[in-house]
Amino acid sequence: MSQKEIWSETLHANFGQYFSVDKVLYHDKTEHQDLIIFENATLGRIMALDGTVQTTERDEFIYHEMMAHVPLFAHGNAKRVLIIGGGDGGMLREVCRHQYLESITMVEIDAGVVEFCRQYLPNHNAGAYDDPRFNLIIDDGVNFVNTTDQKFDVIISDCTDPIGPGEGLFTSEFYQGCQRCLNEGGIFVAQNGVCFLQQDEAVTSHKKLSNYFADSGFYQAAIPTYYGGIMTFAWASQNPALRHVDLATLQQRFDNASFTCRYYNPAVHVGSFALPQYLLDALFTGCTI
């Protein structure tokens, strides 16, 4: 029996995870980062940037549903959405399911990610790039939010980890820019790592977001692909009530949307804001594990 090639993630220095490679579909350096897309017998097609897994066909729906539907159903009347990053197309797919939206803008720094994910991960976008409401802008997200004249109801930062091209999307400059281009009652959410292993990211993000938003916090989802399992998402708004929309209201909005999900539902939405004590201790007492 021939031995399969092994691809190892390099996100953490002292531990990590590996994946067997059935077939490499694409591997090269784009203008900004190393991009590989390969097939795995269990997880389907996997895309990684600079040695860190970004998405897999098997469980991408969890990440994309929770980042898209939690803020959109909490808002309840969003018309304009901004996605920062998201070049694989999965976030766009989920956002496009909300038929009442009038405009969906995606700002992606790396055109290569969009091009090759459209070719090799077509199930992620599922045709969403052809939605007439969609506008793609190739630009740095920090620059865009600090220079645009547009306003948005929901901003979703579908960023990489705070290294390489994604580093700027965890800065005060970026958070301040998002605050300036959010409409009144708007919501900002962002990928914020696996808090058990990356607590410093959550603590730092919380401190920075608190400087620009009246209400900031986190919600979570269990996503097997990301080492450590429990992914944390940053949340920020000027209206604290948006983080506490009741179950009955969410259920009505979800029913009116007339689509189903594989992970998200209104009860999961409410429960996702219940945080483990170790994270609360890190955020509010400075005690870390």
Swiss-Prot record:
Main location: cytoplasm
PROSITE patterns in the cross-refs: PABS_1, PABS_2
InterPro entries tied to this protein: PABS, PABS_CS, SAM-dependent_MTases_sf, Spermi_synthase, Spermidine_synt_N, Spermidine_synt_N_sf
Family stated for the protein in its record: Belongs to the spermidine/spermine synthase family.
Pfam families per the UniProt record, alphabetical: Spermine_synt_N (PF17284), Spermine_synth (PF01564)
E.C. number: 2.5.1.16
SUPFAM superfamilies documented for this protein: S-adenosyl-L-methionine-dependent methyltransferases
UniProt: spermidine binding residues: 64, 88, 158-161
Entry keywords, A to Z: Cytoplasm, Polyamine biosynthesis, Spermidine biosynthesis, Transferase
Gene field: speE
Protein role: Catalyzes the irreversible transfer of a propylamine group from the amino donor S-adenosylmethioninamine (decarboxy-AdoMet) to putrescine (1,4-diaminobutane) to yield spermidine.
Alphabetized HAMAP family for the sequence: Spermidine_synth
Residues annotated as catalytic: 158 (proton acceptor)
Location(s) in or outside the cell: Cytoplasm
Quaternary state and interactors: Homodimer or homotetramer.
CDD domains: AdoMet_MTases
Identification of the protein by name: Polyamine aminopropyltransferase
Residue ranges of every copy of the PABS domain listed in the record: 5-238
Biological-process GO terms, alphabetical: spermidine biosynthetic process
Species of provenance: Photorhabdus laumondii subsp. laumondii (strain DSM 15139 / CIP 105565 / TT01) (Photorhabdus luminescens subsp. laumondii)
GO-annotated cellular components: cytosol
